[in-house]
Swiss-Prot record:
Residues 21-31 have a biased composition (Gly residues). Part of the 50S ribosomal subunit. This is Large ribosomal subunit protein uL15. Gene3D superfamilies: 3.100.10.10. Keywords: Ribonucleoprotein, Ribosomal protein, RNA-binding, rRNA-binding. PANTHER family: 50S RIBOSOMAL PROTEIN L15, LARGE RIBOSOMAL SUBUNIT PROTEIN UL15M. One of its GO terms (cellular component) is cytosolic large ribosomal subunit. Residues 20-49 are annotated as: Disordered. The gene is rplO. Pfam families: Ribosomal_L27A.
Amino acid sequence: MFLNTIQPAVGATHAGRRVGRGIGSGLGKTGGRGHKGQKSRSGGFHKVGFEGGQMPLQRRLPKRGFKSLTASANAQLRLSELESIAVNEIDILVLKQAGLIASTVSNVKVIASGEISKAVALKGIKVTKGARAAIEAVGGKIEM
């Protein structure tokens, strides 16, 4: 097989319909466009969202909210998720490699949700009061 010999399967393609070539073709004179009007002219059609002069929907509805740029930079982590990591010394890089936080995250905070039974050392990770108590109760430590 060569690139210059490749062809579509028999019957897979159809010739384009020739319009404006006489009454007998079924698509003569107006060529399937109907009579007069903007849509019958060449190059004549309204822009997307145009509603004939009526105020378009995208302008009738109010603007609402915004996308926070800091939302993707911050993440929360549960105590029970720390339990699943095999390493004892945990920092943001370890969490990214474990797939617990997104690669765009730069700030992580551990919240007191779930339980932890092994001692872990957190580096550069913020914790809530309840999470700090739970981690230190099992012999873990938190470094900033």
